């Protein structure tokens, strides 16, 4: 959950949060 899709919980969250 960060800026790009990667985690799965957010639409634009990935390698940051």
Curated annotation (Swiss-Prot):
Cited InterPro entries: Pyrokinin_CS
PROSITE patterns in the record: PYROKININ
Biological source species: Pycnoscelus surinamensis (Surinam cockroach)
Gene Ontology terms, MF aspect: neuropeptide hormone activity
Name of the protein in question: Pyrokinin-5a
Keywords associated with the record: Amidation, Neuropeptide, Secreted
Entry keyword Secreted: yes
One of the protein's GO biological processes: neuropeptide signaling pathway
This protein's GO CC annotations: extracellular region
Protein purpose: Myoactive.
UniProt tissue specificity: Expressed in abdominal perisympathetic organs and abdominal ganglia.
Subcellular location: Secreted
Family membership: Belongs to the pyrokinin family.
């Amino acid at each position: 959950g960060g800026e790009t899709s990667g985690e799965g919980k957010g639409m634009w969250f990935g390698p940051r949060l």
